[in-house]
Every structure is written in C-alpha cells, then in structure tokens.
C-alpha cells in the first residue's frame, strides 16, 4: 500500500515537473490553476512570481500554520541588452548564471529556451520544450592543454541557436512574434530539457532538473489541499529569487509576506501578533550524504537519500536560522506519532552550507524550522531525490497542517 501511495505521489509530481517545472512563472500559473480547482478561502498572487493560498481555521484564526517554499531553480539567464553574438561558427545567445552552479556540468547537455518577452504591448510566453533544443559545447580534451575547461569562465556559456542571424531573427518574428529589440529586457532562460525519470534497479530514485525546490513546493501544495478543513488557519507560500538571496519584490525579504497576514487581520497590531504566534516550515531541500565526499559532511548529522525527510535545526557557517528548542522537538514528535521516517541534518560548519528563507521569518518572530528531502547533485542540471523521501515529506507537511 505504501509503495502504491509513493507511486501515486510520484506520478503527480512527474506530471507537474514535465509540464511546468522549467520556470517559476509556469509553476505559479500551475499553482493558481490548482487553487481554482480546490477549496481555498483566499489567494494572494503578486507579480507573476509569488503566490500564497489561505484556508481559514474552523476555530483558531489568530495564528497560522505556514509552509513556505521557493519555485525558482538555478539556470542560465539570457543576458539583457543585446544577447546575440555572431561568430564564424554560428549565432549564439550569451547567458549569465542564475544561482550557484558548476559551469562545466551545464555544458554538452540538451537545453530549452523558456521565459517571457514583452512585445506589441503584451506578454508573450516562450517554452521550446519538446520542439527545439540547444546546447553549450565544451572543448575537446585533446586541445585543452591549458586546462580551460577546468577553470571555465562564464563568458564561455554561449548557447548556439543557429547558423545565420537573419534566419534566426526571422524565425523569432514569424513563430514567436518577437523582434531583436524585444530581447533587450526579456526574461528568458535556458534550462535542461530532461523529463523526470526513475533511476536504479528498484526505481526508487527520481532524476530531474529543479528538485530544489520544486519537490518541496509540490509536497506543500498537495499537503495543503489534502489536509482539508483544519482547526487552525493554514497558509502555503510560494516565493521566488531564493537562489539569489530573496531580495526582490517576490522574494521572502519583501514586505509582501507581511501583506499576506495583513489581509487576514483587522489592523497592524493584530497582524504582528498573528505572525509572532504562527508556526512556519521553511520547505527546502538539504544535501544528501555521499560517502565518496564524506569529509564535507557531518556524519553524525547527515541525511541519506531514501532514509526519510530531513529535519534541519540549523545550517551553515553562520547557522542561519536556529529553530526554537520546543518547536524543533514538537516537529520530531509529530513525525514519530505519525510513523514518518525522518533524519536530523545539518551542514558541516567549516564547509559553508546554504541559506534558506527561514531566517527571514525568524526575524518576524515566527517559530520556524527547515525541513526538506535530501538531494544528490544539488544545483546540477539533473538532481536526484527518493520517492520514499518525497512521500515522507508530504506526510509530515500534511500532519503539520492537521495538528
């Protein structure tokens, strides 16, 4: 039965990722459409890259159980201005990294162009998946005596899109309805074209671009819907720009978070009280332990892929958010009570460690903790998680809302 439930969740996740996982604007549209199909009391959508769903509590409305995730993922953005580069070997689009990536891992793989362009006073969306693919080529090792591939610079991240610039521009105008001038301030990116696939003889592992953090976004959305009517108000938030620091208008440093709570209260005083009384899960992935890189992990506090959802009380050199003592233990007891496999995880403080949005909620006075599935090959074009961990994360999120 558990295996069947894992597969059901996996199939839903695969459908979402294959169709909408290429970019956060597609994810926000998907979440909005799902909200329209379900029983939601309030939808707060802001500037195409932020959305929050609210279901009012049956008895308790002066606080909320909140799960927040981000729907952006590392990618290659087409640079603004004039991104076209014409060389003797073809026409290229110049890209810049969005988020932390290892440049070499994004070469010699199939890429698709996604995003949006402002043309003829309207937004035109682009997604070439399933139709047109592109790539960035590497230098053959026979000619790389200077080890240029080892110390790759961002200026080599050029995506070849054709032979002749006029033909390329004619294509964009005839098929997409956009001109060269429209590229100056476009919001376009190249992302891997891979569909979600199963890995291993047991098929327990899931390979996909963008598990960070769309796996957590998916689990929180499903848990929000499946938990039904609850005594306490529940909120699920999907933000963006986490991979670059959450500083933009649709990131978690924005005042937009306060606005969500203001919509649910009568005045600023009660709104601040509601925030301070609320419990928040920062749903973000954690680093999956790998024995071949064991010196980079805290072996006594590492999450192994396939062994359960990761509960992260603190992380990073500066510890980021340090989850309140009582709250972290309440979450642990919730997992035990519901027979949910969990692991305690934290990064090795001498090795750095990533940041999440939890610290921005902590500064507002919320009880907040980081929870997410362990991931292998994080920030690569094809990240890896476990079906069992995805199910455990969903179960814990659902129990959090229900309790």
Language-model regions, residue ranges each:
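N-terminal hydrophobic/helix-forming segments and targeting peptides
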Residues: 1-403
């Amino acid at each position: 039965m558990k295996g069947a439930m894992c597969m059901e969740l996996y199939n839903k996740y695969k459908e979402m990722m294959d169709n909408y996982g290429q970019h956060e604007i597609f994810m926000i549209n998907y979440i909005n459409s799902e909200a329209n199909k379900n029983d939601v009391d309030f939808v707060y959508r802001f500037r195409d890259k932020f959305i929050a769903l609210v279901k009012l509590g049956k008895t308790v409305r002066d606080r909320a159980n909140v799960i927040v995730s981000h729907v952006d993922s590392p990618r290659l953005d087409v640079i603004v201005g004039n991104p076209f580069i014409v060389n003797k070997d073809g026409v290229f689009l110049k890209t810049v990294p969005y988020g932390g990536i290892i440049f070499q891992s994004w070469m010699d793989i199939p890429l698709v162009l996604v995003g949006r362009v402002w043309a003829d006073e309207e937004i035109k969306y682009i997604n070439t998946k399933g139709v047109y693919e592109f790539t960035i080529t590497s230098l053959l090792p026979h000619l790389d005596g200077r080890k240029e591939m080892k110390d790759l610079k961002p200026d080599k991240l050029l995506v070849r899109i054709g032979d002749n610039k006029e033909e390329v521009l004619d294509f964009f105008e005839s098929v997409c309805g956009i001109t060269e001038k429209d590229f100056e301030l476009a919001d376009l990116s190249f992302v891997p074209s891979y569909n979600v696939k199963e890995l291993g003889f047991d098929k327990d592992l899931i390979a996909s671009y963008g598990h960070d953090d769309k796996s957590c976004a998916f689990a929180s959305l499903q848990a929000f819907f499946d938990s039904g009517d609850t005594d306490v108000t529940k909120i699920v938030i999907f933000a963006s720009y986490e991979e670059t620091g959450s500083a933009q208008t649709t990131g978690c440093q924005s005042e937009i978070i306060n606005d969500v709570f203001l919509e649910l209260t009568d005045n600023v005083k009660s709104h601040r009280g509601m925030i301070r009384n609320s419990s928040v899960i920062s749903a973000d992935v954690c680093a999956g332990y790998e024995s071949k890189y064991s010196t980079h992990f805290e072996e006594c506090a590492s999450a192994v892929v396939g062994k359960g959802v990761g509960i992260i009380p603190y992380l990073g050199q500066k510890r980021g958010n340090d989850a309140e003592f009582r709250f972290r233990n309440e979450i642990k007891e919730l997992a035990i009570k519901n027979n949910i496999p969990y692991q305690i995880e934290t990064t090795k403080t001498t090795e750095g460690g990533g940041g999440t949005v939890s610290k921005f909620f902590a500064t507002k006075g919320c009880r907040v903790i980081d929870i997410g599935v362990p991931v292998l090959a994080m920030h690569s074009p094809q990240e890896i998680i476990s079906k069992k961990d995805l199910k455990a994360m969903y179960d814990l999120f659902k129990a959090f809302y229900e309790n």
